Design a protein with these regions (language model features):
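N-terminal glycine-rich anion-binding loops that anchor highly charged ligand groups
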Residues: 8-54, 61-69, 288
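A glycine-rich phosphate/pyrophosphate-binding beta-strand-loop-alpha-helix module
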Residues: 40, 87-143
């Protein structure tokens, strides 16, 4: 039996280095499916430690496809798994934030458990998702936004894909994705499905020297800054961690209903996003997009506060800049035409 797995079976905890080695073993295919399943099951049952998570993140980053780092980009990504079937809020927010001047490197994938993954809805919107690393960097430079399709950068994840699907419950990999940005983005909005996991992820990321990151979780269970209830926030800025609660009404936004932001398909999500960007939708869909886009502008240094960022996001939608940005993102380059 793998010695790291043996430690877990016997009730032990892994050091950062041991966790790093265990993840390398998983990513390299050195473990049997049974050993992978046992490791993931034990961790899920007893809960991962922050030290273990840091070791896992380092290993995942080391196994990712090489891409030039950029500390200026912002990612809006979440763990998913909240089971609430909302439209792709972080994707809509990314488009608005990029229209307002933030450099967005959106990391995402197809749907696993939700009605619509970020890759699914971007395709429905007519935006190319499988660009090369070079083309993605060019898109970020020229259009303020590029999409990093997770399977292109984390191909070693295929070693555990079958086991994860067979297990059918959340594992540590649900938490690792947002912490393993291919460009090692130092500025992020990370949505988490529970307050406890948000704390764990923040503690795990802190040793990796993030510049400005918000971990957000709605009291309604949404892995976003929500509009139907208060939101819990952990803010990491350099080496300072603060925790607070946000009430959307403090931003001048009326609390809405969850049903107003739920969808049944990527196509329905894309339609709602188009209506938001065209400023043809008011209420909860508009407000939750502006709130999360405002957060991206805040961590990206384009606004001095969450409040200022939210107001800037609303104005970006109302003045037509967000609509124009969507049209710009849909325009294919010569390289994208070749790979389409």
């Amino acid at each position: 039996m793998n010695q790291r797995l043996s430690a877990l079976v016997n009730g032990g905890y892994l050091s950062e280095n041991e966790a790093n080695k265990l993840m390398h073993d998983m990513m390299s295919g050195s473990l049997t499916d049974a050993e992978v399943a046992a490791s993931l099951s034990i961790l899920a049952h007893r809960g991962e430690t922050a030290e273990e998570m840091t070791g896992f993140v380092k290993a995942m980053r080391q196994n990712a496809a090489p891409m030039e780092q950029s500390f200026d980009v912002v990612d809006t990504c979440g763990t998913g798994g909240d089971g609430l079937s909302t439209f792709n809020i972080s994707t809509a927010a990314a488009i608005v934030a990029s229209a307002a001047g933030a450099k967005i490197a959106k990391h995402g994938n197809r749907s696993v458990s939700s009605k619509s993954g970020s890759a699914d809805v971007l395709e429905c919107l007519g935006i190319h998702i499988q660009s090369t690393p070079e083309e993605t960097r060019r898109q970020i430079q020229e259009k303020n936004m590029g999409f990093l399709f997770a399977p292109l950068y984390h191909s070693s994840m295929k070693q555990v894909a079958v086991v994860r699907k067979q297990l059918g419950f959340r594992t540590v990999f649900n938490l690792l994705g947002p912490l393993c940005h291919p460009m090692q983005a130092k500025k992020q909005i990370i949505g988490v499905y529970s307050k406890e996991k948000a704390k764990l992820m923040a503690k795990a990321l802190a040793p990796l020297e993030p510049e400005h990151v918000l971990f957000v979780c709605g009291e309604d269970g949404l892995d976003e800054l929500t509009i139907t209830a208060n939101s819990y926030v952990i803010e990491l800025k350099k080496d300072v961690m603060t925790e607070y609660t946000l009430n959307p009404e403090d931003f001048g936004l009326e609390k809405g209903s969850l049903s107003d932001i739920q969808v049944q398909s990527p196509e329905e999500s894309a339609k709602l996003i188009q209506n938001i960007l065209n400023h043809q939708t008011e209420g909860a869909p508009l407000h939750i997009t502006a709130l999360n886009a405002g957060a991206a502008l805040y961590v990206g240094g384009k606004s001095e506060s969450l409040m200022a960022g939210t107001l800037k996001a609303l104005e970006t939608i109302k003045n037509g800049a967000a609509k124009e940005q969507l049209a710009r993102l849909k325009q294919k380059t010569k390289e994208e035409e070749i790979y389409a």
